[in-house]
């Protein structure tokens, strides 16, 4: 490895076995023969590299790119490949170094080695078809080559974390324990130390992703295969290079396509494959086939572009390790005797500071560069933090990724403070973000770098506010880097909390409690009362018994129990009597006492308590403005127990004030919390004032890196997209095999959307498409798709989508990724698909008939007799089309006409009579059989009621569920012609709670009245079931709130 960080690691793996050949004695005796004897003119023309990794000179000057004092490691790689004019080649010095000790005093060992080589009947031959290979005779050399010292000390422990000391070694691997059984040892069969062992511990490098046995790490160091360089030495006299060279690594498995020929890599039997199929760069991620027609010699020396994320990667040429200065003997002799101990101590402190930071950053300014610092809290989100840390090390320079469990962010921010256009990504919860913002305040960086958030764990209200979502699922890190790079910089208000003793109370009346808050600055909220009391109980219990709080589910259960207990005890009921709140000179105490608030929140951002919006949208209330996180105002909100409960279903608290300064006085010890950190504060006077504004990165909906959105001509007016659904079982088992997962998907239908349609809008159209398909898939109409290859029609899935379905991103090269529902408005349809959309349904039941032909289907409709007039092209177009624009096809009037066109009919066929009899008698098996034989679910009984009316009245939940799954959607709210009652009215009158829940979950109307003006809730109350009435009322209120929020958002 030279000072510029060159690295061409191409030699630790053996080439494919060639035909057996008897070696010549002269070439087999010395490493020179191994290097020059096999490197012929045709071999050089093929661009192959041959050398003996066991030789010391080969380690330093060969194609592996090892350290070289002259700084020509990469250049030697080229000489070794071409052969050069000198017949001894790149390994000549190594050969001489090994032959001289042999001729000097080890004649017997040399003869023994010669005899061993003569008796050998098999020898590997360099393949001319391979671009990068080696001779493969290194395993015949002595375990410790002649001339090299044998290490007698204890085995070196594999390094798992970066070394930031002055002893750091460039190109050192970061080994992580792994249990991957499919990856073969990187050394290959010839050099693997435990090749005959059935099972051995393995390690995987987090930076270059090679896998070796733990026992083989020492052998890997002997052949000097280095990881990609992360810095450069500061003492080198060689001129500084402003570019980075490729770091080539052999791969037995490789995703994507070859950069040269555009073809995929052969991986049909990759699990057990021992052949090297690709050569890829650890920096730019380019990959080539391992053959001369694809990977050529000039690729070794060419500069690396650092790939798609070059703008955020910190190149190793920027990071310099400073050598400790050494005093000469003359200078030490001329030192004068010190007379001041104080001065000596000061110098010692300076030396300690210099020793702790032997690295400096010397960036090259460029307006296109946005270098990124990543801080990961591994303790957030269970094991998510550790996985995210490893993924960022693979995509970026490991020296720009920091583990907050090892050290805080201060040293890293201090080291990178002079880097222009710096951006920061905080991977953790809101507390991690606050920690980084406080350090930025302390360092007073100018300009302050903006901070993005990758939310881990739960809560994450600040991340939700900045459009990063409520938690990380499995979104590709590559897309996250693009989003951080293209994100919009916004400001976030930060507020000071100044605490003093309450001057109105004498010291002897102060109660027990702490005298200061856990934080003196907050970014999200500051609250007191009920919510802080519950959080405080949880923290105190966890500190007393930490072993009982090792599960997220247990933590949630404790929170729920503590909240319920506090509700019964009403410990915060007298909060309004012991506080005084003054906002910008306005005393809010009388209003607080009148409404008897049990919780008061000072809110800076719109989100609170894991995504709720307590301020809501003021709408017509002209006294208040919509909430913003950058307006210099803080919102004051009061909560009663009722409004706190309504908060979870879309409600909001009582808006009190929007102000710039708050004066809060407490007259007893009250539980409080600052950004989730609770305490019980003694009576105090708290002053809240604006501190400053921090720069944050907000996830942008329109990403500038997408050429689709930059070029208006590339955005089509309309897109015709097929929708396919995938079960959770198939997703978990096949998400790394896109072809098999595509084959396992089941088609839903076809949508026609606008070119700029986002996923949030697309979700509504998919739900409508599902309703139409449910209507058409009744007994009289069956929808099929046609296999493009076999032309055989097969029935579409009639199973309803569960409310928990989500979109899948199918554009990544390696696998499918789930998209968080809260971030659907940030993604366009064109960003996740080209001609088809995949959705994941976690509750989908996989049947034996489930499956999809390899070709994508087209919809074909099998018409039933008597309905040819109803099934017309206009109606079919309405079923299949999703207009991303407002068209008449989905207007309310059309939907009403569509519903009334499916009128009930009297039973005609024998199968219709059988279905009616099965519903009346509660025979589910007979119902299923009659429906499969062609019976219709749109028939009426003697009382002019639908089948769903009869099933709801009898209380047979299985039959109700079957009709809901297979019948048309209009059956839900179809009214009885005599009484005007729906199926939900019937179930409420009979007090069938399970049936009522099925109907409500299916979307039955809760506000539709019968001929007497009664709703289902009122019918349940008249039937003497107040619990059922309360349930229906709560569901009705929930839907009303959801509807109001939808209108507000629009």
Swiss-Prot record:
Catalysed transformations (reactions): a 1,2-diacyl-sn-glycerol + ATP = a 1,2-diacyl-sn-glycero-3-phosphate + ADP + H(+); 1,2-di-(9Z-octadecenoyl)-sn-glycerol + ATP = 1,2-di-(9Z-octadecenoyl)-sn-glycero-3-phosphate + ADP + H(+); 1-octadecanoyl-2-(5Z,8Z,11Z,14Z-eicosatetraenoyl)-sn-glycerol + ATP = 1-octadecanoyl-2-(5Z,8Z,11Z,14Z-eicosatetraenoyl)-sn-glycero-3-phosphate + ADP + H(+); 1-octadecanoyl-2-(9Z,12Z)-octadecadienoyl-sn-glycerol + ATP = 1-octadecanoyl-2-(9Z,12Z-octadecadienoyl)-sn-glycero-3-phosphate + ADP + H(+)
PDZ-binding (motif): residue ranges: 1048-1050
CDD domains per the UniProt record, alphabetical: C1_DGKiota_rpt1, C1_DGKiota_rpt2
Main location: other
EC number: 2.7.1.107
Pathway participation: Lipid metabolism; glycerolipid metabolism
Domain DAGKc: 367-502
Gene Ontology cellular component terms for the protein in this record: axon terminus; cytoplasm; cytosol; dendritic spine; excitatory synapse; glutamatergic synapse; guanyl-nucleotide exchange factor complex; neuronal cell body
Residue stretches spanning the membrane: none
The keyword Membrane belongs to this UniProt entry's keyword annotation: yes
Keywords, sorted A to Z: ANK repeat, ATP-binding, Cell membrane, Cell projection, Cytoplasm, Cytoplasmic vesicle, Kinase, Lipid metabolism, Membrane, Nucleotide-binding, Nucleus, Repeat, Synapse, Transferase
Region (Disordered): 53-74, 92-111, 328-356
Record bears the keyword Glycoprotein: no
Highest rank taxon of the organism: Eukaryota
Pfam families: Ank_2 (PF12796), C1_1 (PF00130), DAGK_acc (PF00609), DAGK_cat (PF00781), DGKI (PF23578)
InterPro entries (alphabetical): Ankyrin_rpt, Ankyrin_rpt-contain_sf, ATP-NAD_kinase_N, C1_DGKiota_rpt1, C1_DGKiota_rpt2, DGK, DGKI-like_dom, Diacylglycerol_kin_accessory
Compartment annotation: Cell projection, Axon; Cell projection, Dendrite; Presynapse; Postsynapse
Null mutant phenotype: Homozygous knockout mice lacking Dgki do not display overt phenotype. They are slower to habituation to a novel environment, but have normal levels of locomotor activity, anxiety, and motor coordination. They display a small increase in presynaptic release probability and synapses show a reduction in metabotropic glutamate receptor-dependent long-term depression.
Residue stretches of biased makeup (Low complexity): 92-105
Tissues in which the UniProt entry reports expression: In brain, expressed in the hippocampus and cerebellum with stronger expression in the Purkinje cell layer (at protein level). Expressed in kidney.
GO BP of this protein: excitatory postsynaptic potential; glycerolipid metabolic process; habituation; neurotransmitter secretion; phospholipase C-activating G protein-coupled receptor signaling pathway; positive regulation of Ras protein signal transduction; presynaptic modulation of chemical synaptic transmission; Ras protein signal transduction
Binding partners and assembly: Interacts (via PDZ-binding motif) with DLG4; controls the localization of DGKI to the synapse. Interacts (via PDZ-binding motif) with DLG1. Interacts (via PDZ-binding motif) with DLG2. Interacts (via PDZ-binding motif) with DLG3. May interact with RASGRP3; involved in the regulation of RASGRP3 activity.
Function: Diacylglycerol kinase that converts diacylglycerol/DAG into phosphatidic acid/phosphatidate/PA and regulates the respective levels of these two bioactive lipids. Thereby, acts as a central switch between the signaling pathways activated by these second messengers with different cellular targets and opposite effects in numerous biological processes. Has probably no preference for any of the diacylglycerols in terms of the acyl chain composition, especially for the acyl chain at the sn-2 position.
Similarity annotation: Belongs to the eukaryotic diacylglycerol kinase family.
Name under which the protein is recorded: Diacylglycerol kinase iota
Organism: Mus musculus
Name of the encoding gene: Dgki
